[in-house]
Protein backbone atom coordinates (compact mmCIF):
# COMPACT_ATOMS: atom_id res chain seq x y z
CA UNK A 1 0.00 0.00 0.00
CA UNK A 2 1.06 3.59 -0.50
CA UNK A 3 -1.13 4.81 2.36
CA UNK A 4 0.46 5.27 5.75
CA UNK A 5 -2.34 6.71 7.91
CA UNK A 6 -2.87 3.42 9.79
CA UNK A 7 0.60 3.89 11.35
CA UNK A 8 -0.32 7.20 13.03
CA UNK A 9 -2.14 5.66 16.03
CA UNK A 10 0.74 3.21 16.49
CA UNK A 11 3.23 6.08 16.69
CA UNK A 12 1.03 7.89 19.20
CA UNK A 13 1.05 4.69 21.27
CA UNK A 14 4.87 4.64 21.17
CA UNK A 15 4.95 8.14 22.64
CA UNK A 16 2.28 7.47 25.26
CA UNK A 17 3.24 3.99 26.48
CA UNK A 18 5.78 4.22 29.34
CA UNK A 19 6.84 0.61 28.69
CA UNK A 20 8.13 1.58 25.23
CA UNK A 21 11.56 3.20 25.56
CA UNK A 22 12.49 3.83 21.92
CA UNK A 23 11.40 3.63 18.29
CA UNK A 24 13.04 1.74 15.44
CA UNK A 25 11.76 2.50 11.93
CA UNK A 26 12.69 0.01 9.18
CA UNK A 27 12.24 1.39 5.68
CA UNK A 28 11.89 -0.30 2.33
CA UNK A 29 9.58 1.86 0.25
CA UNK A 30 9.20 3.13 -3.31
CA UNK A 31 7.42 6.15 -1.87
CA UNK A 32 3.78 7.00 -2.24
CA UNK A 33 1.35 9.39 -0.63
CA UNK A 34 3.28 12.62 -0.08
CA UNK A 35 0.85 14.21 2.40
CA UNK A 36 0.56 11.09 4.55
CA UNK A 37 4.29 10.40 4.38
CA UNK A 38 5.21 13.92 5.42
CA UNK A 39 2.67 13.76 8.26
CA UNK A 40 4.28 10.54 9.49
CA UNK A 41 7.74 12.07 9.22
CA UNK A 42 6.63 15.06 11.32
CA UNK A 43 5.10 12.71 13.87
CA UNK A 44 8.26 10.58 14.13
CA UNK A 45 10.39 13.71 14.48
CA UNK A 46 8.20 14.93 17.35
CA UNK A 47 8.46 11.73 19.43
CA UNK A 48 10.45 12.49 22.56
CA UNK A 49 11.85 8.97 22.97
CA UNK A 50 15.05 7.86 21.22
CA UNK A 51 14.37 6.98 17.58
CA UNK A 52 16.42 5.42 14.81
CA UNK A 53 15.61 4.65 11.18
CA UNK A 54 17.25 2.09 8.91
CA UNK A 55 16.91 2.18 5.12
CA UNK A 56 17.12 -1.47 4.08
CA UNK A 57 16.21 -1.71 0.40
CA UNK A 58 14.67 1.47 -0.89
CA UNK A 59 14.03 4.79 0.76
CA UNK A 60 12.74 6.51 -2.34
CA UNK A 61 10.74 9.69 -2.74
CA UNK A 62 8.72 10.39 0.44
CA UNK A 63 10.79 7.64 2.07
CA UNK A 64 13.57 10.22 2.38
CA UNK A 65 11.72 12.44 4.90
CA UNK A 66 10.69 9.27 6.74
CA UNK A 67 14.33 8.13 6.93
CA UNK A 68 15.65 11.44 8.25
CA UNK A 69 12.77 12.01 10.70
CA UNK A 70 14.33 9.79 13.36
CA UNK A 71 16.99 11.15 15.70
CA UNK A 72 19.58 8.91 14.01
CA UNK A 73 19.46 7.47 10.49
CA UNK A 74 21.25 4.44 9.09
CA UNK A 75 21.42 2.92 5.62
CA UNK A 76 22.80 -0.39 4.41
CA UNK A 77 25.40 -0.12 1.61
CA UNK A 78 23.16 -1.66 -1.07
CA UNK A 79 20.06 0.39 -0.30
CA UNK A 80 19.10 3.22 -2.64
CA UNK A 81 17.30 6.51 -2.28
CA UNK A 82 15.82 8.39 -5.24
CA UNK A 83 15.74 12.16 -4.84
CA UNK A 84 13.26 13.67 -7.30
CA UNK A 85 10.67 16.46 -7.55
CA UNK A 86 7.09 15.91 -6.37
CA UNK A 87 5.03 14.00 -8.90
CA UNK A 88 1.33 13.46 -9.42
CA UNK A 89 -0.48 10.72 -11.27
CA UNK A 90 -3.80 11.35 -12.92
CA UNK A 91 -5.31 14.47 -14.36
CA UNK A 92 -4.29 17.92 -13.15
CA UNK A 93 -5.27 21.42 -14.21
CA UNK A 94 -2.55 23.16 -16.21
CA UNK A 95 -2.87 26.48 -14.40
CA UNK A 96 -0.35 28.56 -12.44
CA UNK A 97 -2.05 27.68 -9.14
CA UNK A 98 -1.33 23.99 -9.72
CA UNK A 99 2.33 24.70 -10.38
CA UNK A 100 2.46 26.81 -7.22
CA UNK A 101 0.95 23.92 -5.25
CA UNK A 102 3.71 21.60 -6.53
CA UNK A 103 6.36 24.20 -5.63
CA UNK A 104 4.95 24.65 -2.13
CA UNK A 105 4.84 20.91 -1.52
CA UNK A 106 8.42 20.55 -2.73
CA UNK A 107 9.53 23.41 -0.47
CA UNK A 108 7.89 21.68 2.52
CA UNK A 109 9.70 18.42 1.77
CA UNK A 110 13.06 20.07 1.04
CA UNK A 111 12.84 22.16 4.21
CA UNK A 112 11.98 19.13 6.32
CA UNK A 113 14.82 17.03 4.89
CA UNK A 114 17.37 19.83 5.33
CA UNK A 115 16.30 20.52 8.92
CA UNK A 116 16.46 16.83 9.93
CA UNK A 117 19.67 15.81 8.17
CA UNK A 118 23.06 17.28 7.35
CA UNK A 119 22.28 18.16 3.72
CA UNK A 120 21.55 21.76 2.77
CA UNK A 121 18.38 22.83 0.96
CA UNK A 122 20.56 23.99 -1.93
CA UNK A 123 22.35 20.65 -2.31
CA UNK A 124 19.13 18.65 -1.93
CA UNK A 125 17.52 20.74 -4.67
CA UNK A 126 20.57 20.21 -6.91
CA UNK A 127 20.26 16.44 -6.50
CA UNK A 128 16.51 16.62 -7.06
CA UNK A 129 16.79 18.63 -10.29
CA UNK A 130 19.80 16.80 -11.78
CA UNK A 131 19.41 15.78 -15.40
CA UNK A 132 21.25 13.05 -17.24
CA UNK A 133 21.18 10.39 -14.53
CA UNK A 134 17.63 9.06 -14.80
CA UNK A 135 16.25 8.14 -18.23
CA UNK A 136 13.63 10.69 -19.31
CA UNK A 137 13.43 12.10 -15.79
CA UNK A 138 15.14 14.41 -13.33
CA UNK A 139 16.65 13.42 -10.02
CA UNK A 140 19.42 11.36 -8.48
CA UNK A 141 19.74 7.82 -7.18
CA UNK A 142 22.01 7.50 -4.14
CA UNK A 143 23.28 4.21 -2.78
CA UNK A 144 24.06 3.85 0.92
CA UNK A 145 27.58 5.24 0.77
CA UNK A 146 26.57 8.20 -1.41
CA UNK A 147 23.62 9.00 0.89
CA UNK A 148 26.03 9.21 3.83
CA UNK A 149 28.60 11.17 1.81
CA UNK A 150 25.89 13.71 0.86
CA UNK A 151 24.98 13.97 4.58
CA UNK A 152 21.43 12.88 3.83
CA UNK A 153 21.80 9.86 6.15
CA UNK A 154 23.86 9.88 9.35
CA UNK A 155 25.76 6.64 8.95
CA UNK A 156 26.24 3.42 7.06
CA UNK A 157 24.88 0.52 9.07
CA UNK A 158 22.13 -2.01 9.51
CA UNK A 159 19.85 -3.38 12.17
CA UNK A 160 22.51 -4.18 14.78
CA UNK A 161 24.06 -0.71 14.42
CA UNK A 162 20.69 1.00 14.85
CA UNK A 163 19.77 -1.17 17.83
CA UNK A 164 23.16 -0.54 19.47
CA UNK A 165 22.64 3.22 19.04
CA UNK A 166 19.10 3.00 20.44
CA UNK A 167 20.21 0.97 23.47
CA UNK A 168 22.98 3.51 24.22
CA UNK A 169 20.49 6.36 24.00
CA UNK A 170 17.97 4.57 26.21
CA UNK A 171 20.63 3.73 28.81
CA UNK A 172 21.82 7.34 28.78
CA UNK A 173 18.38 8.67 29.74
What is each PLM-predicted segment?
Residues 1-54, 58-64, 68-84, 88-173:
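N-terminal organellar transit peptides
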Amino acid sequence: TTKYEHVIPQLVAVQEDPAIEGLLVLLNTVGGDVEAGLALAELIASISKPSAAVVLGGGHSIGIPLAVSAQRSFIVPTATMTVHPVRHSGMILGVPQTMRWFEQMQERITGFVASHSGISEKRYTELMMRTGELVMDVGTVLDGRKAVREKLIDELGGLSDALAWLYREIEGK
